[in-house]
């Protein structure tokens, strides 16, 4: 989790030039306005016409400067039928979520320490789940209608590492021999997968 705040409010100065390791510099409260504690951004559904059939609406410190130094952030994730939030990791935060509509298969992968086990369940509207920091996880819409969930993190900037994109769309690319050895496949398979994620998409 993030460090404890040292003041009630520290509205992020996103245009500031100062370098800060944890959080952003603070705007003077006289310049912060009166809406820094409120946001309506998650009321709108995202566009799920994407390769994954999902859309993430982020509400971290970059989108909600009032969360600066408070150690929290939120996302809304919308899913088309059959849409997925592909396997990914949040390196800096634990995630807790609630399915608001539809039904999602939520999968959480333990580390080698816990036997590399997959924990999964279909989570329905009104039900919740928790994902420990740093563990790989995914969500998949198993229903016949659109679905969405709202998740919260114990960090103003939880970070995200999409596993497929990281392996096959990095810049510069991971050398193909590394991936053929690690994945135990032929070079042609790796090159095909790289072509699917070219340009970081």
UniProtKB/Swiss-Prot annotation:
Cupin type-1 domain: residues covered: 40-191
Keyword Oxidoreductase: yes
Entry-listed glycosylation sites: 47
Subcellular location: Secreted, Extracellular space, Apoplast; Secreted, Cell wall
Keywords: Apoplast, Cell wall, Cell wall biogenesis/degradation, Disulfide bond, Glycoprotein, Manganese, Metal-binding, Oxidoreductase, Secreted, Stress response
Catalytic activity reported: oxalate + O2 + 2 H(+) = H2O2 + 2 CO2
Residues that hold Mn(2+) according to the record: 88, 90, 95, 137
EC numbers, comma separated: 1.2.3.4
Cysteine disulfide partners in this protein: 10-26
Gene3D superfamilies, per the entry: Jelly Rolls
Residues noted as binding oxalate in the record, renumbered to the chain: 75, 85, 90, 95
GO cellular component: apoplast; superoxide dismutase complex
Keyword Chloroplast attributed: no
Entry comment on modification after translation: Glycosylated. A form called G contains antennary GlcNAc residues, whereas a form called G' lacks antennary GlcNAc residues in its otherwise identical glycans.
Subunit structure: Homo hexamer; a trimer of dimers.
Annotated PANTHER family: GERMIN-LIKE PROTEIN SUBFAMILY 3 MEMBER 3
Protein's name in the database: Oxalate oxidase 1
Organism field: Hordeum vulgare
